[in-house]
Amino acid sequence: MLSEEEMLRRLSGELKPSRFVHSLGVRDTAVELARIYGCDEEQCRLAGILHDCAKYMSLEQMLDIIHKGGIELYPHEDEYEPLLHAPAGAALAKLSYGINDEQILSAIRKHTTGKDMDLLEAIIFVADMIEPTRTYIPGCDELRALAWNDIFAAVEKCKQMTKEYCESQGHRVFSI
């Protein structure tokens, strides 16, 4: 596994600057939530840093690494390209960053779906929505307050907010 310093060095070259800052915010927010809920801080750090590592891959690259990583797609997941960076990210984290911890890989894999989440997965899912640069999301302050008190209620609120946003943009919403 690469050191965190090496991961950050690579990510800073592969992500847009704003996405890199977002990833740092997810890492830091996830660690704060880990302290509140008694989750493993190192797992939260690594999943937070790497959750968007495949964000700027082409569709072809994402599908290729998903296949190479042996990641199975959920029904309809391949019909909405923005969802694919999560399974591609899990595969990339494993194959290129040396992450072998299945819990970390699962948190990266599920961070766009909210499907049947354990504590680590819930923390990454919510941290992705509430990290400090996410000031443009309507209802984010309410979501932040909820996250510090009930992480699984915050997961449900994130799902609701995401569904409402997708519907308002005319995107098809899949029940995953």
Residues of each region from the PLM?
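Active-site hotspot residues in diverse enzymes, especially metal/ion-binding acidic/histidine motifs
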Residues: 4
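Divalent metal-dependent catalytic cores for phosphoryl transfer on phosphate-bearing substrates
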Residues: 8-13, 31-153
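Glycine-rich, aromatic-bearing surface loops/beta-hairpins
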Residues: 155-157
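Charged phosphate-binding loop/patch that engages nucleotide di/tri-phosphates or the phosphate backbone
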Residues: 161-176
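N-terminal glycine-rich anion-binding loops that anchor highly charged ligand groups
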Residues: 22
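A short, charge-rich alpha-helical start-of-domain segment used by transcription regulators
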Residues: 17-19
